[in-house]
């Protein structure tokens, strides 16, 4: 969920935006803005050469019975984000105990490394296959690897958001992947004229894959963004997958 939901469920949310040489400040207390605007703009509280946004918030104990964060979920999300953005470094610090826990997440292999991590306890059949392309203003990248397992594990992301129920980008990937494999199988003579095509389940048996797209105007089903709904995402993913495979 986005900042509007976090704001509504927090005792306070404090924001500092570093942009165009200045630090701008905003603050909300139980969803109500407490910073006065200056000529319709957030006030400047300092100068800086940096860019970025710093957000501090405190979950509201009047809404939540428990306000302690689950560190494993926070770490997992940070690590996932590092895989999806190979040039990004994320620093995790937990200062709640007597000693600060400090972890640096940086994954220069990107989603190739993500697939390797997903398969680290499984027997793999080949090196990770990776490709990336752009069409219709949509960037598509995917990585996959087959294992000796009998199920598929395909994860879909749009703009770094995990789509637990998949969506159009996953549909495009699956459809074209099956089409290309069938065409290749017939070209090699593995499938004869009298043979039926492999099904999608046949082709993806044992596959681990990560499909990540960057979309300028994504549409999701539901507030939690579990499923991508853009038809152009299906076309873009299908075209890039078909061209690269």
Predicted regions located by residue number:
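Flexible helix-coil linker/hinge segments at domain or subdomain boundaries
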Residues: 231-245
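GHKL-type ATPase core
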Residues: 1-117
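Surface-exposed beta-strand-to-loop junctions
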Residues: 56-58, 155, 239
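Helical (often loop-to-helix) elements that flank the catalytic cores of nucleotide-handling enzymes
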Residues: 219-234
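Flexible beta-alpha connector loops of hexameric P-loop NTPases
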Residues: 64, 162-165, 233
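GHKL/Histidine-kinase-like ATPase module
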Residues: 42, 72, 79-81, 87-223
């Amino acid at each position: 969920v986005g900042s509007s939901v976090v704001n509504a469920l927090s005792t306070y949310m404090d924001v500092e935006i570093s942009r165009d040489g200045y630090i701008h400040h905003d603050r909300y207390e139980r969803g109500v803005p407490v910073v006065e605007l200056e000529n319709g703009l957030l006030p400047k509280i300092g100068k800086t050469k940096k860019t970025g946004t710093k957000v501090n918030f405190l979950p509201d104990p009047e809404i939540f019975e428990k306000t302690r964060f689950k560190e494993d979920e926070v770490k997992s999300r940070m690590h996932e984000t590092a895989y999806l953005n190979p040039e990004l470094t994320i620093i995790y610090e937990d200062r709640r105990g007597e000693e600060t826990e400090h972890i640096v997440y940086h994954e220069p292999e990107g989603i190739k490394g993500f697939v390797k991590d997903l398969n680290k306890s499984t027997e793999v059949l080949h090196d990770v296959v990776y490709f990336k392309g752009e069409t219709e203003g949509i960037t598509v990248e995917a990585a996959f690897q087959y294992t000796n397992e009998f199920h598929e594990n395909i994860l879909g992301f749009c703009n770094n958001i995990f789509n637990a129920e998949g969506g159009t980008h996953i549909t495009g990937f699956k459809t074209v992947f099956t089409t290309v494999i069938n065409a290749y199988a017939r070209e090699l003579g593995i499938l004869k004229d009298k043979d039926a095509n492999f099904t999608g389940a046949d082709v993806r048996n044992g596959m681990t894959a990560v499909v990540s797209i960057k979309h300028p105007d994504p549409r999701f089903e539901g507030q939690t963004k579990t499923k991508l709904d853009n038809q152009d995402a299906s076309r873009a993913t299908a075209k890039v997958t078909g061209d690269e495979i």
